Amino acid sequence: MTWRKIIHIDMDAFYASVEQRDDPSLRGQPVVVGGSPEGRGVVAAASYEARAFGIRSAQPAAWARRRCPEAIFLRPRFDRYRAISRQIHGIFADFATTIEPLSLDEAYLDVTGSQRFRGSATHMAQAIRRRIREETGLTASAGVSYNKLLAKLASDEGKPDGLYVVPPEDGPAYVAAQPIRRLHGVGPATAARLERLGIRQVGDLLDWELADLHVFLGNRAGTLHDAARGIDHRPVRPRRSRKSIGAERTFGDDTRDLGEIHQRLAPLITKVATRLEHHELVARTVTLKLRYADFESITRRVSPPGPVAQAADIEALIPALLAETEAGSRPVRLLGVSLSGLQPKQREQDLFSALT
């Protein structure tokens, strides 16, 4: 059997590391990049010094400040991060022709047919990490395996500034031993549900018939059952034009408190706004999705007169969208935010200028 050779590269605390590189006084300090801790700001990235206090991305910035009062809070500089990301992706292009960017700081590379380093994906990953360090002054972690699932798990294993390899003969046993929460697509609510069923490690999924798993997991059952055996057929896909950008989350406890709903929406808004920035796009339409405790799902959308380009633009539209729902009177278990009508930022800015 011919195995694929997949490398997953993930920069270490990318935004925060760029800030520490550019300002030596920040090195060794707990740095938090994101929104203001004075309001509803959300953490976009945290240095490893800040992570030692339990601070992670998507957490409320106000909570992060309480956790670490001495933390240094910085606004994101997306233009700077994009420029460095382009430099890093240029390095990737020297090793692979099939590259799937996931974000500014993360990508999959399919090096199956490459003859670099006599076809050794491990040596290629070492060379990529070395060049990133030499050319940008930043560190990256890499995972090498025969599919995307295992390459991603491996790069997490190697963090920070490391390399981890999962060969084909070790793949099934390696993934089976992982906590169920490490699987892509298993969020906190799904993990809690599975753990109540006694499924705490990925391998525990194999004790269940696929039909029984389908009752609890729906269409995800087959994918997760394959994952438990180290199987992932997803190809590495070069970037294609996007039609929408979205994020949603199911929560372990339902709520009808509007203040809490706004708090739970904040990291989702930050996530989609960050993706919008990464792809240098603006949106014409914002859609809010709710699922009530009885599993009824609804969406509400708005298309403002001007372009939606950042988190503040989305936040300004949320109260009116929520007012069109029964949030506050009916308990909510899932929230989602999506952006559509995507256009390149410069093109939209030129059009908007011409109209005004």
From Swiss-Prot:
Lineage, broadest ranks: Bacteria, Pseudomonadati, Pseudomonadota, Gammaproteobacteria, Chromatiales
Subunit organization: Monomer.
GO terms for cellular component: cytosol
Enzyme class name: transferase
Active site (catalytic residues): E106
Entry's localization field: Cytoplasm
Annotated binding of Mg(2+), by residue: D10, D105
Family to which this protein belongs: Belongs to the DNA polymerase type-Y family.
Record-given protein name: DNA polymerase IV
